[in-house]
Amino acid sequence: MIDITLPLTDIHRHLDGNIRAQTILDLGRQFNIALPAQTLETLIPHVQVTSTEPDLVSFLTKLDWGVKVLASLDACRRVAFENIEDAARNGLHYVELRFSPGYMAMAHQLPIAGVVEAVIDGVRDGCNTFGVEARLIGIMSRTFGEAACLQELDALLAHRENITALDLAGDELGFPGSLFLSHFNRARDAGWHITVHAGEAAGPESIWQAIRELGAERIGHGVKAVEDRALMDFLVQQRIGIESCLTSNIQTSTVASLADHPLKTFLEHGVLASLNTDDPAVQGVDIIHEYHVAAPAAGLSREQIRQAQINGLEIAFLSDGEKRALREKVAAA
């Protein structure tokens, strides 16, 4: 189902939600951190979704063991490097990796700016080693409140030339976008792109807010947009993309089943919706699964899957020249 003549992208992929179970085991042993299991087989149920979670917040707890073992900046650098290696193994030509430096720093009180620098270094080394193109998106974890998000933003801005965009993720219902207006004003002043998790746990009004108040150029998940035809029309008119994550939306109980997922409706409506993974290690999926298994189960035709692949590059945070160069590189391969 993947068109090998086109660039394959994943533009909604959490670096801190893609820490390998083996790496969690290795780092736990290295730093003498107590883990809930001591073998790979018995650890996996603790760090990977094995059945549908009741809600988004429950799903997010599966990510916690991955960051609990980040006891040094070298550990952060390692998981960043491995994220690029995983992308290369999946055949991705271009990936946008998003990460919350405060979340990664929290368990061991690492310097947040140091975490940002370690991630930048690990991703750069990975790109040089594996030939994948990547950009970094900084996340503010809204779950920890406005002040914590300000610390994350300051750390990200200290390395602004290596960050492409700002995102807001976490507890959408408990911490609405209205709390973070000044944060996003600073991000836009820095020249960053804006993408926001919205319409995942909350309704279409959260998406409107992300666009109108925070300046979102893309929406993460955005499943509730299907409830508001005027919003879908607006997304089409303004070319605001939706970063769809099929399997993730089932595992978080955001959508009841793949057959109920609105991605097909978005594509039929002309919305620039793309296929992405979200938290591949936690979910136990990869981009190939999303194209070959999840997308057909969501009712997408072969042509719609191809359109979603095209959309992934179309709405990527790259210049027109960079997109053209990537298309030419893949076509010539």
Curated annotation (Swiss-Prot):
Q: Does the keyword ATP-binding apply?
A: no
**Gene Ontology CC terms, in alphabetical order:** cytosol
State which Enzyme Commission number(s) the record gives: 3.5.4.4
Q: Which InterPro entries does the UniProt entry name for this protein?
A: A/AMP_deam_AS, A_deaminase, A_deaminase_dom, Ado/ade_deaminase, Metal_Hydrolase
Q: Which GO terms describe its biological process?
A: adenosine catabolic process; hypoxanthine salvage; inosine biosynthetic process; nucleotide metabolic process; purine ribonucleoside monophosphate biosynthetic process
Reaction catalysed by this chain? adenosine + H2O + H(+) = inosine + NH4(+); 2'-deoxyadenosine + H2O + H(+) = 2'-deoxyinosine + NH4(+)
Keywords, A to Z, come to: Hydrolase, Metal-binding, Nucleotide metabolism, Zinc
* Metal-binding found in the keyword field: yes
Which residue positions are annotated as catalytic?
Answer: E200 (proton donor)
Q: What does the entry list as the binding residues for substrate?
A: H14, D16, G170, D279
An example of a GO molecular function for this protein is: 2'-deoxyadenosine deaminase activity
**Any note on cofactor binding?**
Binds 1 zinc ion per subunit.
| Secretion signal span | none
Cofactor(s), names only, from the UniProt record? Zn(2+)
Marked site positions, Important for catalytic activity = H221
Protein residues bound to Zn(2+): H12, H14, H197, D278
**Enzyme class, broadest EC rank:** hydrolase
Show the HAMAP family listed in the entry: A_deaminase
Family stated for the protein in its record: Belongs to the metallo-dependent hydrolases superfamily. Adenosine and AMP deaminases family. Adenosine deaminase subfamily.
Q: Which PANTHER family match?
A: ADENOSINE DEAMINASE (PTHR11409:SF43)
Q: Briefly state the protein's biological role.
A: Catalyzes the hydrolytic deamination of adenosine and 2-deoxyadenosine.
What is the recorded name of this protein?
A: Adenosine deaminase
Gene name in the database record:
add
